[in-house]
């Protein structure tokens, strides 16, 4: 029988590529549920092509348009974030691909885990925000979490067949983004258009900005801790501009395994769907005759502070990664609206880390409260920044930033 796939975020970059995988492997998979946040026209087109059992639009104001457009098809139509959380529990679903962007992916992922649905995890923010909670839930329910990020999929593939051999370190590769060789002066004047031009990968706007600022790599460091059970000091980032080696694992005997391939997200998506099998596919093949120059560099955390901030959050633990994620979501949205500078994003994130109340052992309600508080504070900091006030020079609130648990 064909596996029934629920794609949360089907109109985004990962979602559309997942549908390409389903189309190519139509004898193996079917799109059972498709969801989108706002892109109703794209969702309509996908629904008409793939004929899922159900579609969900998070923006309830788009429900009537979606319902009317699909009235001639036997497709169930729902709206609202609660509907997304509920649909993942459908007994017919075999795999849930969490391709939603940001914090919004947390609750649907939790519901899918409770329903014991295998998770193909593309929404890295779920583990960034609440990694310990998600890991505990997955362990107790016996729910597998299969990584879709190319770097974590690479590590996962490197670990296949190792039978628990101890890891010395995980080495995550980073392209370095479009500003790898820029000076601080040049970074200060980076525009939205420049930041949206990634040299190697085709991604959505938010993750492309995160890649340019190296926050994406910082999030991947946090994600790696929870996926592979390694300490922060066992996770190394190296800049590899060619994006051919997707990541590596070094074992305690010094041997290093690497996973290589063309920069194409369809491969890790398909591997998450098919694991432990590999399916024949038409993806572009790596031609080693063309790979004459594979280079590696140390990341510069002075110019790209977000990577250092992510490591700091991981070391501190508790709700600190949640604070970083919420502040980052706010500043990236502001940057895309031309309301804050490229370097100003790091200033706001760092200041939010020093202001928002720290919780050492958070529960789900603490993550919700942390996310809301951080977003409010980050918005206030952006407003101050727009008036010319140097956010980095503002005093921290020692009273608010206390260990509350």
Describe the role of every protein-language-model region.
Residues 1-405:
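Catalytic, metal-anchored helix/loop core of enzyme active sites in primary metabolism
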